[in-house]
Amino acid sequence: MILAFDTYYFENKAKTVCLEFEDWNEDKSFKVHTEIIDSVSEYIPGEFYKRELPCIISLLNQIDLKNIEAIIVDGFVYLDNYKKYGLGGHLYEKLNKEIPIIGVAKTNFASIEKYKKPLLRGNSIKPLYITSIGIDLEEAFQKVESMAGEFRIPTLLKELDRLTKE
């Protein structure tokens, strides 16, 4: 089983959505988990995880974590070449380093070069940035690359983004 998370912020609330699916190339069959949390923390530059991690953990507490192959987050695992944790790294620690985390970021974070890999999909000239922990970066890259969809953002991750804003 694979889990993918995204959170959308509005007013003083956060809507976190998780898609649960079986195969990396899945495009239609998935289960949706959703939660809205009131009174979320303010965004602090460089400390995004402090805002989003509690939302993800709260929703994860409602999901059976047995047989989870990996978790995809919208963001970075590492923030620099010294492996300072981003959202994905902090999530990995919260899960006792038991479930691999793959970060899929839409925008570049310039202070990391060593532990990220740009992925061009479809005809896009703008890459996605892949980072990982608990799984080899090349393997994580290949898994995201194999996800269904002919465009830059894989079909299920596009659907996940849509559901957060619904």
Q: Predicted regions span which residues?
A:
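Two-metal-ion RNase H-like nuclease active-site motif
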Residues: 1-11
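Structural motif
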Residues: 1-3, 69-71, 99-103
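C-terminal binding/interaction regions
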Residues: 3-5, 26, 32-45, 53, ...
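Short beta-strand scaffold segments in enzyme catalytic cores
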Residues: 15-20
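Ordered, amphipathic secondary-structure segments that act as subunit-interaction surfaces
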Residues: 52-83
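Acidic, glycine-rich active-site loops and adjacent beta-strand->loop/helix elements
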Residues: 75-78, 105-110
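Short Gly/Thr/Asp-enriched flexible loops that form oxyanion-binding sites at enzyme active sites
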Residues: 78-95
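N-terminal nucleophile
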Residues: 90-93, 102-107
